[in-house]
């Protein structure tokens, strides 16, 4: 059985150029790409100032375009999963008139980055967006689009900010224009991904360190449950609030500062549900540090065990899994050659990530598909590079 073979960046670039020529009657002058990501471990820890261990994917968003002199932004997406309309036009923001989120929802990510972009003067532009990152699959199609937009704007009007500052602009765009109070992980990995490496991110200090992930005998399998979720209207903001409430009750700025022993000692100060939410986060931060160390020393069995512990904690304490994700994880763990498997992303649908011996890949996919009550889509990805300017 074969994994889905999404188009490579070169094919997406050709599609984007073709669509741009059809829409705007000229060849685009600029092209950029930014990847999706899979988080290997460290779930729902980023907005708690914890540790995360994502890798950038070969699934990317490509944005091509050209500046224009009339102060307008004209956008087109070729994504069939994006909400209508697929094309729209709006004026650049001014001191008197800010951009506002609206419909289509996909364009809000672009608008948000434009609104918060720190350099000036920004010209109007025409652009086409093409992406192989599945929408709502927990692989961060949103940050991929935000970072692609930011990288494109840099070509039109260079900025002088740090990588962390760029990530924060994209994060702010998601907060204010998509209504999702996300952490900074997705934007940082989309900017800083490096081929053959995962990236350990400290979401408190924003320090990053590369963790080797290029062992040829190893495979990272992403399984999409094809259950769609929309985080903005779901339980995500509630989980964030619960974590903040527990930290406050314990007199801490964030759950990053809380040890498991302190949480146990302060159990009476928080609700039962709040305790479970915090127990997940505090344990997950510890697991992520242990997992990065295991990967560095090539101990894939230890890494796999930590992945499974993470899934159980997300299912039982954080309660963001769902029957489909649990089914996919159980199926993977009952297949040969699998080190570990867990849900990844915000939850309530989306994807699982499985670490396995590469030689068992076809067998494992076949087994999962047979065991799963829905229809799964598989992606095999190497750890890839972050955002880049494309040339042809």
Curated annotation (Swiss-Prot):
NCBIfam families: gal_kin
Annotated residues for binding of ATP: 136, 138, 140-141
SUPFAM superfamilies in the cross-refs: GHMP Kinase, C-terminal domain (SSF55060), Ribosomal protein S5 domain 2-like (SSF54211)
A Gene Ontology cellular-component term: cytosol
Subunit structure: Homodimer.
Source species, domain of life: Eukaryota
Involved pathway(s): Carbohydrate metabolism; galactose metabolism
Catalytic activity, as annotated: alpha-D-galactose + ATP = alpha-D-galactose 1-phosphate + ADP + H(+)
Phosphoserine sites (modified residues): 230
Residues noted as binding alpha-D-galactose in the record, renumbered to the chain: 37, 43-44, 46, 186, 236
Name assigned to this protein: Galactokinase
A GO molecular function held by the record: galactokinase activity
Lineage of source species: Eukaryota, Metazoa, Chordata, Craniata, Vertebrata
Pfam families xrefs: GalKase_gal_bdg, GHMP_kinases_C, GHMP_kinases_N
Similarity-based family: Belongs to the GHMP kinase family. GalK subfamily.
Residues of the site described as Transition state stabilizer: 37
Alphabetical list of PANTHER family matching this protein: GALACTOKINASE-RELATED (PTHR10457:SF7), MEVALONATE KINASE/GALACTOKINASE (PTHR10457)
Its EC number(s): 2.7.1.6
Species whose genome carries this gene: Canis lupus familiaris
Keyword 4Fe-4S: no
Keywords recorded for this protein, A-Z: ATP-binding, Carbohydrate metabolism, Galactose metabolism, Kinase, Nucleotide-binding, Phosphoprotein, Transferase
Catalytic residues in the record: 186 (proton acceptor)
Gene3D superfamilies according to UniProt: 3.30.230.10, GHMP kinase, C-terminal domain (3.30.70.890)
Leading EC class: transferase
